[in-house]
């Protein structure tokens, strides 16, 4: 009998038996490997989780830095804007006594005297041009009467009885006040009306 003709007791050729056994082993191997967890898979999953966490931290850090830079840019712009607005404050404060002197000169000048008219006119023009110049840079005069006393722009010097002005309102200006771009640089010294006793 040749090897091809040899039959096993069940009547199968040896090659068929080997093939059947090989298929059974292949069928069993996936079940065994499914039960066993490869440590490399755990490590890969752990590393992927760490990577995702690191990426999230990095994204959050970048967003925080961007927000901080934007806030810094805004603060810098505001600081520059304030510096531009109020850079003249010291200079204006030095000019205020000159303006006050011109005001006082006009108050005491003898306007009825024809010999003084040229000088009075010169003082008036000088004061007007000086006020026009400072107004261009955001300076406003606080000199209104019969308005409610505002502690932000008025400094009450005295209380005076009055029938003409409502109590608590500004009766008279003793010294003009000034604001620079809405901020008081010198409060007006005023007298305030009160009810007659």
From Swiss-Prot:
Biological process per Gene Ontology, one example term: protein folding
| Family, similarity comment | Belongs to the GrpE family.
Q: Which GO terms describe its molecular function?
A: adenyl-nucleotide exchange factor activity; protein homodimerization activity; protein-folding chaperone binding; unfolded protein binding
Signal peptide, first to last residue? none
Q: What is this protein called?
A: Protein GrpE
What Pfam families does the entry give? GrpE
Q: Which SUPFAM superfamilies match?
A: Coiled-coil domain of nucleotide exchange factor GrpE, Head domain of nucleotide exchange factor GrpE
Quaternary structure note: Homodimer.
């Amino acid at each position: 009998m040749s090897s091809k003709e040899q039959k096993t007791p069940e009547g199968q050729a040896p090659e068929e038996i080997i093939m059947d056994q090989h298929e059974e082993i292949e069928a069993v191997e996936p079940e065994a490997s499914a039960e066993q967890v490869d440590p490399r898979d755990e490590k890969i999953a752990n590393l992927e989780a760490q990577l995702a966490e690191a990426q999230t931290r990095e994204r959050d850090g970048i967003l925080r830095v961007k927000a901080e830079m934007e806030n810094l840019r805004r603060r810098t712009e505001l600081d520059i804007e304030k510096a531009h607005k109020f850079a003249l404050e010291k200079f204006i404060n030095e000019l205020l006594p000159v303006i006050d002197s011109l005001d006082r000169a006009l108050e005491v000048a003898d306007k009825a005297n024809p010999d003084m008219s040229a000088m009075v006119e010169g003082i008036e023009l000088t004061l007007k041009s000086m006020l026009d110049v400072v107004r261009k840079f955001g300076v406003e005069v606080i000199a209104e009467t019969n308005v409610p006393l505002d502690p932000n722009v008025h400094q009450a010097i005295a209380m005076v009885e009055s029938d003409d002005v409502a109590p608590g309102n500004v009766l008279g200006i003793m010294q003009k006040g000034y604001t620079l771009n809405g901020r008081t640089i010198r409060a007006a010294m005023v007298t305030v009306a009160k009810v007659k006793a």
